[in-house]
Amino acid sequence: ATVSCFLNEGYEIGSVGTIMPDVEVKIGEENEILLRGKTITKGYYKKAEATAAAIDKDGWFHTGDAGYLKGDQLYLTERIKDLFKTSNGKYVSPQALETKLAIDRYIDQIAIIADQRKFVSALIVPVYGFVKDYAKEKGIEYKNMEELLQHPKVIGLFRARIDTLQQQFAHYEQVKRFTLLPEPFSMERGELTNTLKLKRPVVAKNYKELIDKMYEE
């Protein structure tokens, strides 16, 4: 069933469209998108258990997708199963945060870390050319990229830019600590799929030492 669509006007970047007239939408636990209406399925054919799992007693269909409403516009963030749950019980949408931060000209790749952790952190692959330009502008001397990325001025630059971009997120969703990587994520090390999507378990394994260091007191 069609839940939302784009009209000839009122288009919002990032939205999946305006809610259709005959469809009810609400946001449930874990920011799950719930649907109800004449065009929404009443159940799965000859699959009573699947129907009971998907449709609650009030008739709301549980999509398994996380998102939010802004006026009459619907925004989809990601699948519920892809959400991270911090050790404090808060749910974090890694893709939403990564997408937002990746618009920065200094950030090439980013991996959000939060699952079963006390707070959100990030592994960041900078756009090395822009960082070199910044170093030249600020008169920063360095022997190699690893040394440059540990310079206080460079770290301060990324801290300020990240904080500006993540203002729209709740405090518990925001990146508290980050590490700048001297090499990009790669398919050769199994960190990316052939469509360049992150393989999170592989990234977590390959960078375990760096990740653990960000959570040291």
Show where each model-derived region lies:
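Adenylate-forming
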Residues: 40, 73-102, 131-151, 171-175, ...
